[in-house]
Amino acid sequence: MQNHLTLSQLQKLVKATLDEAFALPVWVSAEIAEIKINYSGHCYLELVEKGGDNGVPLSQARAVIWRTAYARIAGYFEAETGQRLAAGIRILARVMISYHELYGFSLNILDIDPTFTLGDMERQRQITIERLQREGVWDINRENPLPQVVQRIAIVSSRQAAGYQDFCKELGKSPYAFSLTLFDAFMQGAGAEDSIVAALDAVADRMDDFDAVVLIRGGGSASDLNCFNAYRLCAHIAQFPLPILTGIGHDKDTSVADMVAHTALKTPTAVAGWLVERMTGVEGWLDTAAL
């Protein structure tokens, strides 16, 4: 019989080798693919490095932030970046490597450097800007003619969003009869970009029914705004056949979506106010012309 190791012996050798080679923490960059907080307060993550063939990651690993460290790490990260730890965000984490005979390889996250994520977000934002400008689509939506009377409005937002409710309430205070059609979409989170693009495509299928599109979100923190700097969504907005008005609801930075839209305002309420003022102006002009 050949000399052999039992499975547990092999696993223990692997563990001992890793423990010796990585006795101290190391810094690792990766993208968060999944993140969840369990009932005990521990944070479990799936980390990936993209770049493999056919959309398959080059590398993938499980990670954990124990409850005792999670509040500190997550709180500091959000305070510095304006973003919650979420799927789709790239991070630089200080980790201890762990190997268990039953549960395999994992990373224990001890700290996260928010400056890395800030730099990566800004880098991706600049890449989007430069690509849209290079492709010659940067000004297309602004060149769409906006009717004097903007009355038939397609709204891309979430039905549950406070910003959507604020927008409708503000228009409801006016004496004008706006026709509003909601195209429901996720406005934050990992699926937001795909959901908003799908909603815009649905509007495009009925473009003759509308004068303009209003893209609004509001309420909560400034987290989950990355999709409004993403190339695919911003390219859709830039080349959309109807003028798009944005009220994304953040004050610190102007998103690329704002930059390529026909008209950008800070909040959903501000968009509603702008539309009402435009109607008031048209009404005043008609009254003057009738004299």
Descriptions of predicted regions:
Residues V150, A154-L291:
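Short glycine/threonine-rich loop/turn motifs
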Residues M1-L215:
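Acidic, two-metal ion nucleic-acid-processing modules in DNA metabolism proteins
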